[in-house]
Amino acid sequence: LGDRRVLIERVILARTTEERDDALAALLPLQRKDFTELLDAMDGLPVTIRLLDPPLHEFLPDRTELAVKVAVAEARGETGEQVDADRRLLTAVEKLHESNPMLGLRGVRLGLLTPGLFALQVRAIGEAASDQILAGKDPKVEIMVPLVGSVMELHLVRDETERILGQVAAKKGVTLTVPVGTMIELPRAALTAHRIADAADFFSFGTNDLTQTTWGFSRDDVESTVFASYLDKGVFTISPFETIDADGVGRLVQIAAEEGRKTKAGLKLGVCGEHGGDPESIHFFHKTDLDYVSASPFRLPVARLEAGRAAVG
């Protein structure tokens, strides 16, 4: 994220509204430039922009390094503005420390609890798309809200998104049509898809996190400690992070797809995650009547080939 990470850190740690607004104001042109370059490169092609999703700790200074820095300064009897600032920063970081960051303040939760953060991203997207239109280009942008577990979360973000895009369109003198959808990466989201579909123009199944939250696995931990033994014992025949677990995670995908389309016929459904480049998983998603898969660039040739094979049976 470069300079953007530092500015997001300032937004999150701001002690006053003025501090937060200053950081947001500095971040806006950077994000607008990011999105302008993206839409320019993808002119006429669909682009889905996911709002900020990383866990909170990825935007904060390293807690251990900061604690050591403060402890060393205190042991040396150092004083001054920098030492005081480091102490305040450590206090703030300690307050925000999470035991399980992947299930903590991230995604839509971070956006709802950090005033102005998602609003800034939406404004930057709207301004970038408007400038492309005024330049005679054809931006096709969608906004995706991560880690939604309740339809009310999506309603809150969608209402703010539509308000901001309306302001931008009026100011720029253009018409903006920006679908707003959500990731389905929590079991509760899958099981309440009939409600969430009310506020969504599309679903994208985040199967990496959906696998973690369904199995109760922390992927970074269990792959090095559990998986080899589970494969030997026959609990797995293959890692559920490589090929979709059709009976568990896959069943949630099926439920969400069926229930979502009962509420909103024609609801666009897709997959983002490593499973989108796995041949067996792609065939499963085709049978589940999903519209598309997305994959890492190096997996795209396989994904295209297998999607074609699935389509022709």
Please provide the spans of the model-predicted regions.
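Conserved alpha/beta-domain cores
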Residues: 1-313
